[in-house]
A protein has these predicted regions:
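Divalent cation-coordinating acidic motifs and surrounding scaffolds
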Residues: 1-185
Length: 185
């Protein structure tokens, strides 16, 4: 079962890079920090290489909801501290998965983790969700869809199999993030 393969970070580390909500470290960096005025090429190169490396190490039990939430959990402060800014920043949680979510805890618990990290900003108003996901998750109200709709605005999504829509979905998600930044901050 899934629980045989799942150890939440609150019960100790499984020592796997990028597991349990910890950032995937690539090239000595757990995430790439940049400014909108910087040359985008280094970010693109780092992200492309990190995504390929992470994809090759993944498991068939995909738990993106747990991963997105445990990023904000205090148990992951040693690797993730400083990644989520509470004040003056909108958080875009973007899912890129070709499998339905298999995270074991209830959606309400995962939602609370992210809300706790964005209290000063305004909670729901400062968290947006988007993603390239399997088309089935909405229709069956799968856990991933429940999580993506648990925050303020409707998620921006596209079918992971429709590669032609990738740019449009990412562009809309980034535009919504910038729009919300102007509205709420």
């Amino acid at each position: 079962t899934i629980l045989k393969h799942y150890i939440p970070p609150t019960q100790g580390s499984n020592a796997v890079n990028g597991s349990q909500g910890r950032h995937f470290e690539h090239g000595g960096k757990p995430y790439f920090s940049t400014n909108t005025s910087d040359d985008p090429a280094p970010l693109k190169n780092w992200f492309t290489a990190a995504a390929k490396a992470a994809g090759e190490l993944g498991c068939s039990f995909e738990m993106p909801v747990a991963a997105a939430s445990y990023v904000a959990h205090i148990a992951n402060n040693p690797t993730n501290f400083g990644f989520i800014r509470d004040e003056d920043a909108v958080l875009l949680v973007f899912f890129l998965t070709d499998e339905p979510d298999k995270s074991p805890e209830p959606v309400v618990d995962y939602r609370a983790m992210l809300l706790g990290a964005k209290e000063k900003c305004g909670g729901d108003e400062c968290i947006l969700t988007a993603g390239l996901i399997p088309s089935c998750v909405e229709g069956i109200n799968q856990k991933l869809w429940q999580y993506m709709t648990a925050f303020g605005e409707a998620p921006i999504t596209g079918d992971i199999k429709d590669t032609a829509s990738y740019g449009k979905v990412i562009g809309e998600a980034l535009a919504a993030t910038l729009g919300d930044t102007c509205l709420y901050l």
